[in-house]
Amino acid sequence: MGFLTAVTQGLVRGADRMSKWTSKRGPRTFTKSRGAKKTGIYTSDRKFVQIKEMVPEFVVPDLTGFKLKPYVNYRAPAGIDTPLTAKALFQETVAPAIEKDFKEGTFDANNLEKYGFEPTQEGKLFQLYPKNFPR
């Protein structure tokens, strides 16, 4: 095999397939068959003994009555996630509990620790005020 052929194959197939597979490549548990793990051990007389705990077990949920198909079209538009803001986090977590207590008449403005409010930041690793970074 010529030099140009080897370079061309390396560019087309990818360089990782062109280099020689030696014991120096990959971890000790990685076998030559591209990621397959061993499912047993070899005994002293070179016989392979399969160990049940080493055989991978695939857990598949029951999908009877499931309406969605397992295929997603590659032309489907990408999903849009709005960034999480402090206001949105407050509206999702604390606001329902405050509204419920306000309607029941049990809301106490002096007892905000009930909703997760911390009046001081002493003893915290990362403090919001003063800033953790030097100016």
From Swiss-Prot:
Tell me any Pfam family this protein matches: MRP-L27
Q: What residue stretch is flagged as signal peptide?
A: none
Q: Where in the cell is it found?
A: Mitochondrion
Cellular component (GO) terms are: mitochondrial inner membrane; mitochondrial large ribosomal subunit; mitochondrion; ribonucleoprotein complex
Name the Gene Ontology biological process terms.
apoptotic process; mitochondrial translation; translation
Provide the assembly information: Component of the mitochondrial ribosome large subunit (39S) which comprises a 16S rRNA and about 50 distinct proteins. Interacts with BCL2.
* Protein family according to the UniProt entry: Belongs to the mitochondrion-specific ribosomal protein mL41 family.
The UniProt function text for this chain reads: Component of the mitochondrial ribosome large subunit. Also involved in apoptosis and cell cycle. Enhances p53/TP53 stability, thereby contributing to p53/TP53-induced apoptosis in response to growth-inhibitory condition. Enhances p53/TP53 translocation to the mitochondria. Has the ability to arrest the cell cycle at the G1 phase, possibly by stabilizing the CDKN1A and CDKN1B (p27Kip1) proteins.
Record's protein name = Large ribosomal subunit protein mL41
